[in-house]
């Protein structure tokens, strides 16, 4: 008789790091290291990654009440 081995989520291999392609680590998931996580954060902060949306000119915002009070 063969024994069945139950696999848990911890046994499942993680996807590769999106920055360098090395195996990701649980501690820094989805990255392989804090360095790769920092590189990714820097790309977001440097606006190399963007989420598509309407241009700022196309967006309309209602006037804020504190803006109205300042013009008086």
Swiss-Prot record:
Keywords: Metal-binding, Zinc
InterPro entries: DNA_gyrase_inhibitor_YacG (IPR005584), Znf_NHR/GATA (IPR013088)
Record: residues binding Zn(2+): 17, 20, 32, 36
One GO-annotated biological process of the protein: regulation of DNA-templated transcription
One function term, GO molecular function aspect: DNA topoisomerase type II (double strand cut, ATP-hydrolyzing) inhibitor activity
Keyword Metal-binding: yes
Requisite cofactors: Zn(2+)
PANTHER family xref list: DNA GYRASE INHIBITOR YACG (PTHR36150:SF1)
Subunit: Interacts with GyrB.
Similarity field: Belongs to the DNA gyrase inhibitor YacG family.
Protein name, per record: DNA gyrase inhibitor YacG
UniProt organism field: Methylorubrum extorquens (strain PA1) (Methylobacterium extorquens)
């Amino acid at each position: 008789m063969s024994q069945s081995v139950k696999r848990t989520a911890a046994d499942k291999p993680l996807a590769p790091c999106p920055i360098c392609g090395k195996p990701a680590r649980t501690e820094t998931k989805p990255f392989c290291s804090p360095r790769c996580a920092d590189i990714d954060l820097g790309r977001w902060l440097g606006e190399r990654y963007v989420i598509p949306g309407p241009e700022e000119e196309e967006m309309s915002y209602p006037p804020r009440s504190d803006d109205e009070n300042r013009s008086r």
